[in-house]
């Protein structure tokens, strides 16, 4: 079994790690950074991933996709999706299956596809470091992700060419990294406030056993929301001062978003910062500039309710675990937003203790995923991870009631069966509608999917016995079966969201990804060939100007001919032809090199004589013998 990589697929940034010997290690990307922006851009037929995509976002806002994790596994009509639509500069569109997709460069992409591009970058980063092909991974998700979101994340891994051995909850991964090779028994809380999601998990750690007691959270609360508050504040201030609404200008929005994120980070260590955006827009009176002094106190006032929103899930998680805040021996901070002093203050106030800051909040989740990868391929022993399902699972029964089969915070994997019956006389089929959530009425919860059980023998209502079995695997993904006990008829299904990607769609996206990988490789090869050719043209022209008179007319003609031939194909898209003409010019220009060395060797004796002459100076001297 090869190396299993651990990937933290984040809303804002992603990170990849691997077990090296007995220690997990974060792998640096090609730019030398330990995290990669979760940003994809499409520009002039090219796909950019990570830092290169982020750099050009200001000039290409419509085709630069970020924070797609907030859309994954969500329906287009989801209120949270509608909320994001008014904020992001790119288009969020309705897919044929009702899901929220994104549009860029006149193409539609599912959030799973966009996530797959980021995962491919992580995969390449690991392969470049390991010098070997990587095919297996453990990918992290927010603990409060529902089944549809988990399935969509697994689909993203498949599209990226990865076998996803395990989907692991982010706080659980962080706890693994925190408690790795520590023998002390502890009850800990992991407070994870990332770029787009918030989770809190309560765990008991003892002798290598990591048992999650409860989890809670909000999959639409994170750093992006903090950025939006600052962004809206800047828009309001500018509108009051200049009477211009910047919210309608995608270019200005992108610049404001970057400035908001930068200011937020700076105010974690400073108490005041200047936001300067020259030429943010223009009107009939000329260009307009944005120049605002922004303080930490102003920021804290803007986001106070967002920080407060993280406290209620903490309270619920403690209650579900059967603990009081005073029972928690350590609070581990995870996610970039936990660097904010006001967040740390709120955590300290609620739990009554100083939070633990000994882990890197940007890297700890990927490290934990790598440890879990090590467990799965037997590199790491003596660790047992017991996770839970974050939400209750059940089916819709008579009157639209939500009947729970598996309660939230049940340890997974788990299996539960319950017998139901028909609602009408001689009913020959039943529709099983599967929901996930905590509300009492089915319609108020998340519909995961539905299927039919047909061929039930005619009988009075209430007589047939239909056994419904829920099976949740270690990834937190739901499998459901329904069986008529009288006829033995059975229907099994792995729940696919009412939207979601079909197997055929995933297969097509896998092929597209492979094809794009080939095209990207070819594109890179073409660019490298053009760069080499361009460099050779420049150096040949320069040396030809300096030493052309030293060449015979035949040699000079051959070089000029090869030079003209290469210049003629520089703009072509034919890599082989460019390489061929580059090789021809390289061979022809060797004559220039010979002429250069010959000229240098001929001038050397003269140079030496010149040097000796330079040492002769006039001097007075006396003839000693005549003295």
From Swiss-Prot:
Q: A Pfam family for this UniProt protein? A: HSP70
> Looking at the keywords, is Nucleotide-binding present?
yes
Key word Nucleotide-binding present in the record?
A: yes
Sites where Phosphothreonine occurs are at 197
Induction (UniProt)? By stress conditions e.g. heat shock.
TM segment ranges: none
| GO MF term set | ATP binding; ATP-dependent protein folding chaperone; unfolded protein binding
Q: Which InterPro entries match?
A: ATPase_NBD, Chaperone_DnaK, Heat_shock_70_CS, HSP70_C_sf, HSP70_peptide-bd_sf, Hsp_70_fam
Q: Where is this region: Disordered?
A: 598-627
Q: Which UniProt keywords apply?
A: ATP-binding, Chaperone, Nucleotide-binding, Phosphoprotein, Stress response
Q: Where is the composition biased (Basic and acidic residues)?
A: 612-627
Quote the SUPFAM superfamilies the UniProt record gives. Actin-like ATPase domain (SSF53067), Heat shock protein 70kD (HSP70), C-terminal subdomain (SSF100934), Heat shock protein 70kD (HSP70), peptide-binding domain (SSF100920)
What residue spans carry the Polar residues bias annotation?
600-610
Give the protein's biological function: Acts as a chaperone.
> What family is this protein classified in?
Belongs to the heat shock protein 70 family.
Protein name (record): Chaperone protein DnaK
